[in-house]
Amino acid sequence: MILHKGETLFLQGETGPLYHLRSGLLKIVRVHQDGSQILVNLIIPNEIIPHHSLISPNPYYGTAIALITCEVDVLPAATWYEELEDNPERYRAIALLLQDKLRMMQQRIDQVTEVTPAEKLRKLQAWFQAFISPATLTDVLTQDEIGQFLGLRRETINRLLRSQAGSK
């Protein structure tokens, strides 16, 4: 299946299949009761989501939205869990997938624990370039989303981006 920028793959709270992201980039947002959205995760190529449902079914934690054009395989839940039961060696493959995700989260922790806001932003921009080049971070995320992801205010992100543009 092909998803274009801005299209939704699944909605928070629903249940359904798992998905393998072949190419592209997805964001996972949590929608609160007041309607506000918080960016909680980014999904990169070769991830199978939702992560919390790889071993047993669970409703979707957030809403998945394409940041750029994505190619996605639909993995029917019943088939996925039956194959796990029939082939216990697949649990090792799932453990390796989760290990990769944990390593990515460690990189994210490194980004958000940088001392200066400018360095936090620089590290996030460098990480994103591996997935979206030649596009830029601001081509796929709003300043609010960048701020949410880095634990900074939108105003700080705006100031840092203007400073970067002025120094080029």
Predicted regions: what is each one?
Residues T8, L25-R30, I48, E71-V72:
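Short beta-strand segments in beta-sandwich/barrel cores
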Residues L42, V74, V140:
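Short aromatic/basic micro-patch
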Residues I55-A78:
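Ligand-binding loop in jelly-roll beta-barrel domains
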Residues K120, L124-K168:
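Phosphate-/nucleic-acid-contacting segments
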Residues M1-I2, E7, Q33-I49:
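Short acidic-glycine-tyrosine-enriched beta hairpin
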Residues T79-T116:
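A small-molecule sensor/coupling module
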Residues M1-S23:
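Regulatory nucleotide-sensing modules
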Residues I28-V29, H51, G62-A66, F149:
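Short beta-strand His + acidic residue motifs that chelate non-heme Fe in jelly-roll/DSBH
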